[in-house]
Amino acid sequence: MAAQAAPELAKLDLNKNTGSAEASTVPASGSDKDDAENEGDSDDDRDDEQTGGSAEVNAEKKKKKKRPKKKKKTAKVQSVPPRIPLTTLFPNNSFPEGEIVEYLNENSYRTTNEEKRHLDRMNNDFLAEYRQAAEIHRQVRQYAQKELIKPGATLTDIAEGIEDGVRHLTGHLGLEEGDSLVAGMGFPTGLNINHCAAHYSPNAGNKVVLQHGDVMKVDFGVHVNGRIVDSAFTVAFDPVFDPLLTAVKEATNTGIKEAGIDVRMSDIGAAIQETMESYELELNGTSYPIKAIRNLNGHTIGQYEIHGGVNGKSVPIVKGGDQTKMEEGETYAIETFGSTGKGYVRDDMETSHYAKVPSAPSVPLRLTSAKNLYSLINKNFGTLPFCRRYLDRLGQEKYLLGLNNLVSSGLVDAYPPLCDVKGSYTAQFEHTILLRPNVKEVISRGDDY
């Protein structure tokens, strides 16, 4: 889930041609034995037999020379809507790699250093899982951009269309106990409109319809064996918002460019802010400076832990004093948020996102509904974020009392939507990057952004 709020905000309330080869090996119909039995016939008969035999032999030779037609290799393409598991399209598990970026300056030796290359080769399973998740994200978002995200579409239809695609492409629909932990949604689909920047997903009964004048952030995650690809983009139908989208996209690319082993977080944040705040948006004759949302950050990603767990790190998008360095082997979500408002978000609107607290202490639960729900969360989501619709999908009813009890007991965190002032517009772009020993890989990079 894409956005990690700054610490002070976190303290606020609260997915035959068959037979051709066999035909060429069928035994001949004529034989030497037949020719011997017919040897005593008349000359005319013998001539006829010889002629017939010769015809059969010639026919047989033609049969033997005739090779079966080779099947034309047709490129396997994804269906619309996406329903073909990715392992069917890539049967050898050779999934496309992301954008490969060589390290620069003092880290340039890593690209050719044999020891670093050896360490990188040891990560084959890790890379295959991440690349599979990334390709699923690319294929599903391509479908969403072309077929789902249109003025007049409901947020529920968009969210469920994305999530159904992810689940089918992973091959894990998540309806059986534990299936969602093998592969599926890395976190719920965020569909954040206008002043809302993050963590909004439609709950059951939501009737919100996307409008032509809306600016919507689409943020969803895909995981394979807990390797979460976290990537987001912004859609606006009115070109008047292009400067806002360009500013945030360029700021994210700046963050990706600056990121690397031994780079200080403060340097990345300063570069991001400088890029983003060089833009402005003119709306109805008024110019609005585009501000980086200072209390939202990028973050490390851990296995099954979207914000990196207890030792997770934050990547600021404004200049500051954080001297923490990035390290070899880490995975980061580099995301930036821009706003025409105050550049600061607060909790607002109805909560949809939740996640089990990693390594939560043992707490006695008095409510039976809370106990049962906590068991279901452990078995189906673990520490992966989930939303109310996911509980509905598993057949849960009247669970809000138990869910709120888990939140108040400190076993589950609630993530309310994060919003700037009403009337403002916000945008987001995000990629997942891997700091491999010898290169940096922008694992979620695609042709779209």
Curated annotation (Swiss-Prot):
PANTHER family from the UniProt entry: METHIONINE AMINOPEPTIDASE 2
Names of required cofactors: Co(2+); Zn(2+); Mn(2+); Fe(2+)
Source organism phylogeny: Eukaryota, Fungi, Dikarya, Ascomycota, Pezizomycotina
Catalysed reaction equations from the record: Release of N-terminal amino acids, preferentially methionine, from peptides and arylamides
The protein's name in its UniProt record: Methionine aminopeptidase 2-2
Annotated a divalent metal cation 2 binding sites: D230, H299, E335, E430
Biased composition (Acidic residues): 34-50
Any single biological process term in GO: proteolysis
GO molecular function: initiator methionyl aminopeptidase activity; metal ion binding; metalloaminopeptidase activity
InterPro entries: Creatinase/aminopeptidase-like (IPR036005), Met_Aminopeptidase_Type2 (IPR050247), Pept_M24 (IPR000994), Pept_M24_MAP (IPR001714), Pept_M24A_MAP2 (IPR002468), Pept_M24A_MAP2_BS (IPR018349), WH-like_DNA-bd_sf (IPR036388), WH_DNA-bd_sf (IPR036390)
